[in-house]
Amino acid sequence: MKKWLAAALLAVGMGHAVSASAQEVTLALPTTSLVFLPNYVAADRGFWQKRGLEVKSPIISGAGSSNAVLSGGADFTTIGPGSTLRLIARGQKLSIIGTTVDRFLLEFVLRKDVAAKLPVKPDADLAARVRALKGISFGVDSINGYSHSFLRYLTGRYGLDAERDVVVSPVQPGSLVPSLAAKRIDGFIYGQPWSLQAVNDADGVIWISGVAGDVPELAPFAYMITIAKPETCQQRRAVCEKLMAGLQDALDFIHADPEGTFEVLRRKLPQMDQGLLRQALSVVRPAIPRSTETKVEAIEKAQEFGLIGGMMAADEQVKDWRIYIDNSFVRR
């Protein structure tokens, strides 16, 4: 592995040269976020270019990136499983060809003064921490999105009603920490780097952490998957092989070179405080798998989350996910 990685780094260090015959493909992303770290590394380090792929990654918000794949506006997307599983359950033809984050990353953050008044401490068992949230006001990035569904998932499992027992307001991610600091909300549900920023700058307390393994039944969890229409990889198999090989190179690089990975993020997110970015990377990096292989269990966990969290209807449950997972592009 070390010899292979050294050779790969040498190759991409020589100007990221692209041949005149490079194939252009579009891999849409739904937003800019740390969870797309493998995609950023593959692009920045030239892992796709050295294979003759020119990968364009336009931002197409939310589920729009999945719809772009279906309509032919994009060849691929890397996205959370929610909209994809729902589309497949509703009969849309999509293949899951890889996983690049396999740990659930969302966290509940409370203001320190709010947490201090609750009847339990942050180290109490999960059920007690969830039940203590009755009456708390939360900010989420979108109603019916992943953060809201995480609230519904946990309250549904531990005896609260997310629609009656807590207050939920939509808050843009960039406004979550300021809203917490201004005491407009008691807490929020989101991921890195905002949860860390709340702890650092707004007297926040991590109350429940998917990153730290507080919800073990959600592991493994296919948190970021890459999808395509089946015919894309049937008709252009070499393109799918090259795309996933580049993402595998990125996984290897992330685990082998933490400092180099930080430099990629620093270039991608120059506006972010470097200390916070480094902290956030230390949290996200362990959630990056060693292989792009998609585990059936990880998709089943994502489906269960969607069913309990209200992202999927009960009659949309898929019984066998194996027919929708294509691991033939995984480097063995």
Locate the predicted segments by residue:
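Bacterial N-terminal signal peptides that target proteins for export
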Residues: 1-6
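N-terminal signal peptide c-region/cleavage motif recognized by signal peptidases
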Residues: 14-19
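Short, glycine-/small- and polar/acidic-enriched structural segments
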Residues: 23-161, 167-170, 186-192, 220
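Short, solvent-exposed loop/beta-turn-alpha elements that line the ligand-binding surface or hinge
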Residues: 50, 115-121, 213-219, 285-295
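Soluble non-cytosolic domains of exported or imported proteins
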Residues: 60-63, 78, 141, 145-146, ...
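Pocket-lining segment of extracytoplasmic ligand-binding domains
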Residues: 174-267
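Secondary-structure end/capping motifs
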Residues: 234-313
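Conserved C-terminal helix/tail region of periplasmic/extracytoplasmic solute-binding proteins
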Residues: 304-332
